Amino acid sequence: MMNRSAEVQRDTLETRVKVRLDLDGTGESRIRIGVPFMEHMLDQVARHGLIDLDIEADGDTHIDDHHTVEDVGITLGQALAQALGDKKGIRRYGHAYVPLDEALSRVVVDFSGRPGLQFHVDFVRARIGQFDVDLFQEFFQGLVNHAALTLHVDNLRGINAHHQAETVFKALGRALRMAAEADPRQADRIPSTKGAL
């Protein structure tokens, strides 16, 4: 299988985001986006997905975190799409259930080529520290649109918002890892009866 790494930079009037990733890494991460709780969540994706992830962002966080969080999702999605290439030889589908104490979340991924998000997380409070939980949906929508993947995110239970979020992001990492894994039985085939994803 080819080298599955990518580097993408996105510059707008609101943000500057640079993402470097390696899908076949060991889970090393350097996340510097100026939004501490989101940095913590992205670190979970790297560690549990065994994705080497380096993200740097400079955004208009003096207004709020919206543009930075959304644009990190967009740029990460672009990097995922670039690293996967034509998707030959991957498993395509991935899923994970992850618990953390009382919280349990399920994430299901399909590198389908069709952006689709089902996000069902009823956070028990509106903020985790200073972080607005509404921004998670913006992140996932940007990721899905630009990675061209179908993503189902469900928090099944939880009474602690931090635990709810952390189980979602750990499960995302594990589901991405499973879906992007090389399948030796498919070798150089695209995992679709259409012959393209």
UniProtKB/Swiss-Prot annotation:
Major location category of this protein: cytoplasm
GO terms of biological process kind: L-histidine biosynthetic process
Transmembrane segments: none
One Gene Ontology term of the molecular function aspect: imidazoleglycerol-phosphate dehydratase activity
Substrates-to-products reaction catalysed: D-erythro-1-(imidazol-4-yl)glycerol 3-phosphate = 3-(imidazol-4-yl)-2-oxopropyl phosphate + H2O
Any one annotated GO CC term: cytoplasm
Cytoplasm found in the keyword field: yes
Domain of life: Bacteria
InterPro entries: IGPD_sf (IPR038494), ImidazoleglycerolP_deHydtase (IPR000807), ImidazoleglycerP_deHydtase_CS (IPR020565), Ribosomal_Su5_D2-typ_SF (IPR020568)
EC number: 4.2.1.19
Cell compartment(s), UniProt: Cytoplasm
Keyword S-adenosyl-L-methionine assigned: no
Alphabetical list of Gene3D superfamilies matching this protein: Imidazole glycerol phosphate dehydratase, domain 1
Keywords recorded for this protein, A-Z: Amino-acid biosynthesis, Cytoplasm, Histidine biosynthesis, Lyase
Pathway: Amino-acid biosynthesis; L-histidine biosynthesis; L-histidine from 5-phospho-alpha-D-ribose 1-diphosphate: step 6/9
Family: Belongs to the imidazoleglycerol-phosphate dehydratase family.
PANTHER family (UniProt xref): IMIDAZOLEGLYCEROL-PHOSPHATE DEHYDRATASE, IMIDAZOLEGLYCEROL-PHOSPHATE DEHYDRATASE HIS7
Protein name: Imidazoleglycerol-phosphate dehydratase
Source organism (scientific name): Alkalilimnicola ehrlichii (strain ATCC BAA-1101 / DSM 17681 / MLHE-1)
Taxonomic lineage from the root: Bacteria, Pseudomonadati, Pseudomonadota, Gammaproteobacteria, Chromatiales
Gene: hisB
